[in-house]
Amino acid sequence: MPHVDLALTDVPLNSPFRVTHAGMNLVVMRTESQIVAYEDSCPHAFWPLSEGSIANGVLECPGHGWEFDVATGRCVNAPAYCLTAVTVLSDGHNVRLHWENKQTPAASQRA
């Protein structure tokens, strides 16, 4: 299973952060209470979510403004859509991201 390790301090607070590793683009987000990661692609028009912005626990896609709950990945505008999460492990200093190895990551974006 592919993974990548980061220092927690590498991930900015309340700002989407892009990680590219082993052919996968991921968006990592850290709030005061948690750190989450998803595939870096909006399920609506496949814009990179790492180029979006976070306000009040919501990530806004830079393409067409779709909004996603940072904690759950669920789309606020169209609840049938959600982001594809990757596993995040943290010891308070370091972060490890795990994901399934897929041929076409964007193919499974829709829930």
Question: Where are the predicted features?
Answer:
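Short cysteine/histidine-rich metal-coordination sites, predominantly Zn2+-binding motifs
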Residues: 56-62, 75-84
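Iron-sulfur (Fe-S) cluster-binding segments and ferredoxin-like electron-carrier domains
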Residues: 48-54, 67-77
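N-terminal pre-ligand scaffold of iron-sulfur
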Residues: 1-56, 84-111
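Short cysteine clusters
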Residues: 42, 61-64
